[in-house]
Amino acid sequence: MEALVTIVTRKELLARERQAGITAGLDSGSSTTKAVIMQDNKIIGKAWTPSHNVVESATFVLNEALAQAGLEYKDIEAMGTTGYGRFTLGEHFKDKVKLIQEELTVNSKGAVWLADRQRGEATIIDIGGMDNKAITVRDGIPDNFTMGGVCADASGRFLEMTSRRLKIDVTQLGALADKGNWRNAKMNSYCSVFGIQDLVTTLGDGKSFEDVAAAACHSVAEQVYEQQLQEIDVRHPIIQVGGTSLISGLVTAVGEVLGEKPIVPADSQFIGAVGGALLSSGFL
């Protein structure tokens, strides 16, 4: 509901295509916290860290991004916050924050800016740690979307569970999956209980780690297709973003399920922070 209100009441702001001045974006997500510093429509500093304490995590990444940009906190002219901790951060950094906005519209803006697709149509897929989003945009403005993670477990979390069972870091899962064949192992990401059962069973059956990783990625791609993309009129190109877009095996699986290789822009995990920095410059 919040996203619908934003789309209606802030359409002019959402149509903004360029960042101006010196602005910061903070994305307080369930798994990671990201910060971006932008100046004159360019990213000049960025940082991320696993999410722990909302304020401490955001302060850390903001300082890291500022150091990378060669700037100080006082140099920031405006800041935008998004993600689960956006209101807490909006209060903590209230001397700088001009925008506190839900992640669906902010992420969409960051995605089309990073992919250089601000004009025309596109579909954005964001597979997150707590939920999945599929968003259609026209000229950078969302006009339809669907959100969800089935049962108590969302797709990004399922990939983390798989990685732990394979005793690897989630950043290694994609390369492992690219070497496997998902058809050799059955996997279910729709529910944490059944997902764990499938992991235990397939590994107990002696399936290779490569095949299990590939099956996990394919299962997630199928979930997004069946639960999210069936609810919207998919438009092309397809832009895949968020932290899970760095898992190459998942991107491969999404392409196989959809029959179209998705675009994964550089810095795709920073969509929320980029969107926050860009949109907050509209208040200068």
Language model regions located:
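Glycine-rich phosphate-binding loop plus the immediately following alpha-helix
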Residues: 53, 139-179, 278
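Conserved phosphate-binding catalytic cores of ATP/NTP-utilizing and phosphoryl-transfer enzymes
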Residues: 3-18, 87-125, 133, 137-140, ...
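Glycine-rich phosphate-binding/hydrolytic loop that grips phosphoryl groups
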Residues: 109-113, 156-160, 252, 265-284
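Glycine-rich phosphate-binding loops at beta-strand->alpha-helix junctions
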Residues: 82-85, 228-257, 268-272
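Gly/Thr-rich phosphate-binding beta-strand-loop-beta motif of the actin/hexokinase/Hsp70
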Residues: 7-44, 120-138, 182-185
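Short glycine-rich, Thr/Ser-proximal phosphate-binding strand/loop in the N-terminal lobe
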Residues: 20-64, 142-151
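Adenine-nucleotide phosphate-binding core of ATP-dependent small-molecule kinases
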Residues: 195-230, 269
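Conserved phosphate-binding/catalytic loops in two-lobed NTP-binding clefts
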Residues: 97-106, 255-274
